[in-house]
């Protein structure tokens, strides 16, 4: 507390000083005397203080700030520092608290600055209400209107200032300070631009089973109930011919990049809020119907020899998101619901080509007309559902024969939020299908039993998609 004793003395004397008017005739030993009676008395007053304090006044000031002394002590210190003649202490010049030894040297004024400075002072005195920015604009306009003769005195003054500046600061070098704020603003704008560029694709990541690019290379298509299983894009089976590549190029162009499967189940998106205009207008003719004739060019002329094709009623309104498909992908086996394990609530996939393990097995769908799967969960309204034929290719020869495999999709609604559509639908909506071995019927498998479906006319040339089948269902 030795350091604090002089401070306490100073504060007491300072209180006395503040109580009465400070005058130069105050006692000489009052260390905190704020008297402006000349440098000699000031130095005499303050030099005993230097002897008393083992540390310099500057360090004392730091200590007072660091240790948060009371207000009276701070005031006393400020009085001492104010009264001290700082020319006696050698110290580096500090500009804005920076540790540079050299003070900031301004550039010499050019001719316009000489003009603007003089004119601004004059105008500011005459018209104090003028705003400074408006004044600067007006001075700039006036400067451009001046002729060479009128500018000459300012040019000469600027030249004189430049020569004087060079004498005063012979080693002066102009070093402009970089403005970080502007670059930060630009980078923020760039970041926001990137975010706005990415955000539409976030929709397509959830919708990626809808757009026909997901059937590119006629490979596996992952319906939304199956997003959790795949961590990469749809793989191309080895049987894919090169004529089938990229049936969904219109939508790929719109998206700008192929969408990756997320490794986990994304949150359920209410696709009723998604603008269908973002999907391909070349692909979707209307919400209610879907025309598959335009994809004839992408299909091979005779299909795949030795590969089974099946025709299945498919939920129409090929709009926004996909239904659990009645067609399974790339050598996967059909199982009736009696064969399923009840806790899975989805068809397990037997994939002989890729054998990819899934976190939770879901329906593997293969969509060979590059049409959009429709989301039956949107069909709570009693509108009529359209059905189009689907041509299943790339089935391996291990395709089992299961007759009358019934699929009751009301059983699946507990496993995934995508199956909540099935609550309003009858279990007879997915009727009994007969799937035959490819060796028996290599080209085309008709629907054998149409008990749940009113009428499904069979197409005569399914490999060319000339007659898309539309079957209309009404809600029970």
From Swiss-Prot:
Residue ranges, compositional bias (Polar residues): 42-52, 211-220, 345-360, 452-476
Chain span(s) of sequence motif 9aaTAD 3: 427-435
Keyword flag Phosphoprotein: no
DNA-binding region, residues: 105-173
GO function terms (MF aspect): DNA-binding transcription factor activity, RNA polymerase II-specific; RNA polymerase II cis-regulatory region sequence-specific DNA binding; ubiquitin-like protein ligase binding
GO biological process: cartilage development; chondrocyte differentiation; gonadal mesoderm development; heart development; morphogenesis of an epithelium; negative regulation of transcription by RNA polymerase II; neural crest formation; oligodendrocyte differentiation
Glycyl lysine isopeptide (Lys-Gly) (interchain with G-Cter in SUMO) crosslink site(s): 61, 364
PROSITE patterns associated with the record: HMG_BOX_2
Stretches the record annotates as Disordered: 1-67, 157-197, 209-274, 318-383, 443-476
Motif annotated as 9aaTAD 1, chain positions: 276-285
Biased composition (Low complexity): 30-41, 319-344, 369-383
GO cellular component: cytoplasm; nucleus
Keywords: Activator, Chondrogenesis, Cytoplasm, Developmental protein, Differentiation, DNA-binding, Gonadal differentiation, Isopeptide bond, Nucleus, Transcription, Transcription regulation, Ubl conjugation
Task performed by this protein: Transcription factor that plays a key role in chondrocytes differentiation and skeletal development. Specifically binds the 5'-ACAAAG-3' DNA motif present in enhancers and super-enhancers and promotes expression of genes important for chondrogenesis, including COL2A1. Plays a central role in successive steps of chondrocyte differentiation. Absolutely required for precartilaginous condensation, the first step in chondrogenesis during which skeletal progenitors differentiate into prechondrocytes.
Protein known as: Transcription factor Sox-9-B
Organism in which the protein naturally occurs: Xenopus laevis
Gene: sox9-b
């Amino acid at each position: 507390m030795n350091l604090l004793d002089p401070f306490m003395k100073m504060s007491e004397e300072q209180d006395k000083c503040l109580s009465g008017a400070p005058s130069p005739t105050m006692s000489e030993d009052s260390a905190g005397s704020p008297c402006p009676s000349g440098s000699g008395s000031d130095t005499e007053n303050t030099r005993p203080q230097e002897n008393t304090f083992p540390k310099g006044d500057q360090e004392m000031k730091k200590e007072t700030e660091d240790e948060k002394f009371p207000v009276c002590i701070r005031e006393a210190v400020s009085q001492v520092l104010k009264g001290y003649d700082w020319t006696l202490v050698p110290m580096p010049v500090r500009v804005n608290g920076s540790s540079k030894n050299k003070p900031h040297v301004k550039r010499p004024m050019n001719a316009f600055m000489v003009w603007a400075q003089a004119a601004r002072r004059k105008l500011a005195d005459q018209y104090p209400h003028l705003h400074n920015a408006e004044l600067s604009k007006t001075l700039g306009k006036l400067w451009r209107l001046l002729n060479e003769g009128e500018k000459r005195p300012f040019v000469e003054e600027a030249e004189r200032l430049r020569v004087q500046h060079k004498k005063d600061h012979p080693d002066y070098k102009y070093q402009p300070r970089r403005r970080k704020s502007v670059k930060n603003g630009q980078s923020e704008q760039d970041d926001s631009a990137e975010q706005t560029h990415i955000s539409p694709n976030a929709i397509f990541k959830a919708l990626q089973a809808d757009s026909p690019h997901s059937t590119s290379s006629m490979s596996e298509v992952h319906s939304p109930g199956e997003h959790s299983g795949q961590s990469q894009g749809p793989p191309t089976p080895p049987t894919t011919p090169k004529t089938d590549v990229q049936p969904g190029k219109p939508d790929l162009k719109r998206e700008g990049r192929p969408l990756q499967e997320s490794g986990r189940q994304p949150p359920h998106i209410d696709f009723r809020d998604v603008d269908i205009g973002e999907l391909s207008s070349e692909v979707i003719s209307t919400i209610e119907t879907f025309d598959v004739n335009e994809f004839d060019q992408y299909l091979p002329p005779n299909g795949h020899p030795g590969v089974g094709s099946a025709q299945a009623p498919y939920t129409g309104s090929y709009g926004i998101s996909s239904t659990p498909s009645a067609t399974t992908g790339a050598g996967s086996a059909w199982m009736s619901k009696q064969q399923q394990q009840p806790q899975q609530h989805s068809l397990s996939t037997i994939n002989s080509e890729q054998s990819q393990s899934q976190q939770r097995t879901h329906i593997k769908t293969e969509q060979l007309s590059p049409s959009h799967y429709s989301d039956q969960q949107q069909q709570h309204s009693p509108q009529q559902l359209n059905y189009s034929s689907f041509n299943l290719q790339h089935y391996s020869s291990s395709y089992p024969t299961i007759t009358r495999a019934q699929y009751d999709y009301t059983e699946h609604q507990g496993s995934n939020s995508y199956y909540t559509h099935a609550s309003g639908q009858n279990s007879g909506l997915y009727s009994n299908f007969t799937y035959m071995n490819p060796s028996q019927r290599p080209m085309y498998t008709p629907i054998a039993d149409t008990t749940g479906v009113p009428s499904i006319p069979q197409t005569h040339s399914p490999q060319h998609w000339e007659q898309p089948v539309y079957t209309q269902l009404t809600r029970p």
